[in-house]
Amino acid sequence: SLVGSEMCIRDRLYIEDIVDEFCDDYIVPCVQANAVYENKYLLGTSMARPGIAKKLVEIARKEGATAICHGATGKGNDQIRFELSIKALAPDLKIIAPWRDSNWKLQSRQDEIDFCTAHGIHLPFSVDSSYSRDRNLWHISHEGLELEDPSLEPNYEHLLVLTTPPEKAPDEGEYVTMTFEKGVPVSVNGKKMKVSDIIRELNTLGGKHGIGIIAVSYTHLRAHETK
């Protein structure tokens, strides 16, 4: 996230599709290891960061770069996930973290929204629905707004993206048959698919029936609590 830089010089832009690698090398091993946080959170954000860091290092080596810059804030766990992964793979590379720079002008989500508005950058959400979201094939997490107040109920009508509020889900259930080989799913309802497509199929089926909603408070490594 380089929004807010006085000047952003772009030489090359890489858009890499690592979905299948994410599924095979991260999601499947984590599921097989029963890697769950607080008995219900399936680590959708946590498990994605090492793969991103790995690709960043590969591209940095390809380009002959001497540093990697990330847009994680100075409060959350992502800065730790990215930097430990990068340092494990490429200890010689310098890490640049603008959010921890005292001269960085954007210190909150509202600052970013104001910056975009002032510079004519369209945002696909309104200020009153500006949840902080992290989405990948495995999950979507939401933070911010009423979620930060334990006394308030989540506004599922505005919040949910991948699933349906339970009260709006069908009354009738739906049967799903899955086949596994060596602990890895290979088909859904008799249709053979690769893991990434199986996850997409199950997201659609589960979302239709209001499956997959959890609420969890977790502790940042820097002792911040987030709901």
Regions of interest found by a model, annotated:
Residues 11-14, 94, 122:
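Conserved beta-strand segments of alpha/beta enzyme cores
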Residues 11, 66, 212:
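Short acidic/polar active-site loop segments enriched in Thr and Asp
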Residues 26-111, 115-119, 165-175, 179-182, ...:
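Active-site adenylate/phosphate-handling loop in enzymes that bind or generate adenylated species
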Residues 1-6, 14-17, 99, 202:
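ATP-dependent adenylation/pyrophosphate-handling site
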Residues 2-11, 219-226:
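Conserved small/polar residues in nucleotide/adenosyl-binding loops
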Residues 90, 94-102, 109-119, 127-131, ...:
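AMP-forming adenylation/ATP pyrophosphatase catalytic core
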Residues 4, 22, 82, 160-161:
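Aromatic-residue hotspot detector
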Residues 10-33, 127-133:
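A conserved beta-strand->alpha-helix junction
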